[in-house]
Amino acid sequence: MKWLAIILVVALLALQYRLWMGEGSIASVVSLNREIAKQKEENARLRERNRLLAAEVDALKQGKDAIEERARNDMGMIKEGETFFMIVDETDKDTKKNKK
């Protein structure tokens, strides 16, 4: 009976070690669940970015309005006969003077 108790205690310790420290342990499962959650967030962010880029590509394929808007905003282009006015904020001037 004494040997049976010792064997059972050793088996219990071996199983507990595997549960807490071994492969597939509670700690590794928790860590994997965290990684899965992070990856799901990243996938959702990238999916939204892809959706926006696809919408932009479709808009550029559809007509001149999107191309014109892009040229105006990104490249600073203006139409023939238009006048471009740049409004400078006074606080920007003061900030630049104080840095010198």
Curated annotation (Swiss-Prot):
It is found in: Cell inner membrane. It is a single-pass type II membrane protein. InterPro entries: Cell_div_FtsB, FtsL/DivIC. Residues 1-3 are cytoplasmic. The chain crosses the membrane at residues 4-21. Residues 22-100 are periplasmic. GO terms for cellular component: cell division site; cell septum; plasma membrane. Its main location: membrane. Residues 26-73 form a coiled coil. Keywords: Cell cycle, Cell division, Cell inner membrane, Cell membrane, Coiled coil, Membrane, Transmembrane, Transmembrane helix. Pfam families: DivIC. Part of a complex composed of FtsB, FtsL and FtsQ. NCBIfam families: PRK00888.1 (NF002058). Belongs to the FtsB family. This is Cell division protein FtsB. It comes from Saccharophagus degradans (strain 2-40 / ATCC 43961 / DSM 17024).
